[in-house]
Amino acid sequence: MSKSLQAIRGMNDILPEQTPAWRYLERTFAGLLDGYGYSEIRLPILEFTELFARGIGEGTDVVDKEMYTFLDRNGESLTMRPEGTAGCVRAVLEHGLSGGGQVQKLWYTGPMFRYEKPQKGRYRQFHQIGVEVFNLPGPDIDAELIILTWRLWQKLGMADAVTLQLNTLGSSEARARYREALVAYLQERFEQLDEDSQRRMTTNPLRILDSKVESTQALLVGAPTLHDYLDEESIAHFEGLKARLDAVGLRYEINQKLVRGLDYYCRTAFEWVTDKLGAQGTVCGGGRYDGLVSQFGGKPTPGVGFAMGVERLVLLLETLGVIPAELNRPADLYVCAFGEPAELAALTLAEQLRSAIPGIRLLVNAGAGSFKSQFKKADKSGARFALILGEDEVANRVVGFKPLRDEGEQQSIAWDALPEHLAACLAQA
């Protein structure tokens, strides 16, 4: 017996009862971004592997362990995008969008792919909403991005469930000095480090700060801190950011171990975290990447952005119980028709009602069936009202109009009067 077909592990179907919450989140965010003057960009899922090797960084877990990479028929190494920033930077460079210092404020959404161990809130195909800004070097735009996310949490009813963690990673020179000091400190304790941290000593030692292993965190208690090695310009940038967040009353925590998982970040780094989802607590993260464009061969261009995980945000909305009930509202009207003339009349009336009452949720019975079976389907649909059309109704140009959710009596309504009558009934809800 052949194996039944099923989805690949960690790549999930989003079923009809789940999609309203996704659409709600995406619509809310798109509307918010439009109000802030951001433009959508749509990016390909496949990119040349070199893009991520250069952008994310050799030696990172993403590049070394997690990317879906393959050779195409021309022998080119291609990768399914594990994140969105590198592809967005590539598009900005390729199409000259940042030339002449022009400011670009962009956003995108779509699936990303990483070969990780699937668990609640962490999948191999996952979806992100990302925002990237180019050619604005100051802390004011960093603050705008963070405030924008804060406003989104307020709109979604989850502001009290998330906490902003903030850090500065300084300049590349400051990080190089700090890296040297951190490596010297940890080298003396190398045998006590966990296996992953030992590997990171030669590839990306700053990521050791973010280790989830308790024994490694205990070793870091006496380690030098990045803030002791910061340059004056980075300190001023960070103070400017904090002043702006303070001005709008946005609370935050300084987390000196927050380094983010990708090599391209500098100066500002931030995450929004929650304690409502267990181990998968980060719902949004980002920061500044002023050197990334030049890494790809472009002129030095300031950049800053963030990405948020849609699956985790939807999971958090469900956990908090703040998904609006009206997202899953049933149909307003179910049209039952008996006989071919009635079916043709039902189709015509339905389209007239859709034109007359924008936003109406109207179902027309398909597949014929007896009066009893159609009424059963009307009731199961959850519709508030049913329209009934048979030979007599068509001959007299009327419909039977029956409430399905209260004790109201069935009425006979002329076709011409139906839009006004139905609109009045719907308005009474």
Curated annotation (Swiss-Prot):
The UniProt record lists the keyword ATP-binding: yes
InterPro entries (UniProt xref): aa-tRNA-synth_II, aa-tRNA-synth_II/BPL/LPL, Anticodon-bd, Anticodon-bd_dom_sf, His-tRNA-ligase, HisRS-like_core, HisRS/HisZ, HisRS_anticodon
Pfam families: HGTP_anticodon (PF03129), tRNA-synt_His (PF13393)
Top-level taxon in the UniProt lineage: Bacteria
PROSITE patterns membership: AA_TRNA_LIGASE_II (PS50862)
Keywords assigned by UniProt, alphabetized: Aminoacyl-tRNA synthetase, ATP-binding, Cytoplasm, Ligase, Nucleotide-binding, Protein biosynthesis
Gene Ontology MF term list: ATP binding; histidine-tRNA ligase activity
GO cellular component annotations of the record: cytoplasm
Catalysed reaction, written as an equation: tRNA(His) + L-histidine + ATP = L-histidyl-tRNA(His) + AMP + diphosphate + H(+)
Protein name, as recorded: Histidine--tRNA ligase
Species of the source: Pseudomonas aeruginosa (strain ATCC 15692 / DSM 22644 / CIP 104116 / JCM 14847 / LMG 12228 / 1C / PRS 101 / PAO1)
Gene: hisS
